[in-house]
From Swiss-Prot:
Any one GO BP annotation for this protein: protein insertion into membrane
Membrane topology according to the record: Multi-pass membrane protein
Subunit-level organization: Interacts with the Sec translocase complex via SecD. Specifically interacts with transmembrane segments of nascent integral membrane proteins during membrane integration.
Organism field: Stutzerimonas stutzeri (strain A1501) (Pseudomonas stutzeri)
Main location: membrane
Protein name: Membrane protein insertase YidC
Annotated localization: Cell inner membrane
Any Pfam family: 60KD_IMP
The protein's role, per its UniProt record: Required for the insertion and/or proper folding and/or complex formation of integral membrane proteins into the membrane. Involved in integration of membrane proteins that insert both dependently and independently of the Sec translocase complex, as well as at least some lipoproteins. Aids folding of multispanning membrane proteins.
GO molecular function, one term: membrane insertase activity
Keywords: Cell inner membrane, Cell membrane, Chaperone, Membrane, Protein transport, Transmembrane, Transmembrane helix, Transport
Amino acid sequence: MDIKRSILLVALAVVAYLMVLQWNQDYGQAALPTETAQSQPAAPALPDSPSATTEGNANDVPAVAGQQQASALPTSAPSSQLIRVRTDVLDLAIDPRGGDIVELHLPQYPRRQDRPDVPFQLFERSSERTYEAQSGLIGDGPDKASGRPQYSSEKTEYQLAEGQDALVVDLNYSADGVNYIKRFTLERGNYALKVNYLIDNQSQQPWTGYLFGQLKRDKSGDPSSSTATGTATYLGAALWTKDEPYRKVSMSNMDDKNLRETVQGGWIAWLQHYFVTAWIPQAGDTNQVQTRKDSQGNYIIGFTGPAVTVPAGAQGETGATLYAGPKSQDKLEELSPGLRLTVDYGILWFIAQPIFWLLQNIHALLGNWGWSIIVLTIVIKLAFFPLSAASYRSMARMRAVSPKMQALKEQFGDDRQKMSQAMMELYKKEKINPLGGCLPILVQMPVFLALYWVLLESVEMRQAPWMFWITDLSIKDPYFILPIIMGVTMFIQQQLNPTPPDPMQARVMKLLPIIFTFFFLWFPAGLVLYWVVNNILSIAQQWYITRQIEAGAKPA
């Protein structure tokens, strides 16, 4: 039994080590831009000259179905004067040339906890980074391979006023007898905004166009992650299809080939740590979903909607929804089926989702994620109480017969076959399951890993405080107090277990608390908190059962 337990513990240590590497990759403090002593804490300023922005290119405009992608043609530089739009949850900038969203900040989500005045930025167009939400009308529409339309607006700044629930921003453009209004509708407290096109065909010919929406991004890293050795969380595109409600399309996939599929409704998205951007077409539309790289090396995932025909002298409308914000499962599920799957819990999603649901409901009562994790740990411990009790009884009996096991070892010496037979007879006589002590580890491992992914992926944990020095449960304990406490509890629990008869095994077991403490130094404080509370509860349960066994009484 001791050999198998040692193997399981070492396996857990290896898994923990791999997760430490991944955690370092995913949860490094994002660096803020270098500031001078005179700089003021504020959102990045809008560019004031074309040289401060990345110029558009013809590949921004997708090809109409059945046509080849247009080759790059010279286009005008983006507008120097962007249109700023602010609500309580979104602060974005629209380029009048094309009407693309080229900047977007999230005022409710500081980039770093120690700088609450600097909001996290999703979309950005600069010399260092490209990440935009683009949309337009092709076919007879104003978006051509030769250039994008130059829209006009009444103002260059729009603000959701106090007491106002919605904000409408209209961009206007006219060409060839057709009047276009590109309308952005933003609502209070909503990260989803509607982008609609109103088409007034005053020409003498019927007008036929196709709506497209796409996300364009360069290969720069996730701003919420830092570079380290290990496997990064997923940074890339994803889409919905009828057969695959959540299909990842990585940058390497786009390097290899372009994707083109026909889907009914659905969505296309770009994922990063904690946040997601997604275009959601109208549910009943049949759309062409495509991925490609443009001439500047940017990665593009987008959709092209069905043909929209507006007769001469008539009016028409088409549009889609853009989401740009946190990976909030409830909000995402309301927008489109399967969009909540962008909160990627990995292969243990079937365990992680109930854990998150339970944790969320506990938090609704307590209002603190740290205490919610403690209560969740107690609930999980109670759920596995009978199984743990049986395991601890087995270990307590093993501890009680340790002198007999040592005597057998001395009796048979190096004759392992006879010693093993004698051990099995002893186990049978004492009614001991030699594998019983392994069950707590086997049971806790999936729950531990699932909780790890809950803390990793759930934006609710981002910058969530507990108490005292733990101001962010999603990052490591800044003073390593919790990992040290965890190591101490692991050492205490180890003293309640039977001593392995093999000296080498005994030395390995003594080292495990130190090894685990080292690994857990870089784990998120919330996960270490779970492990500490679980260890304390296990110690209490195991101590009680061991005392009962050693006293010769049957445990309750």
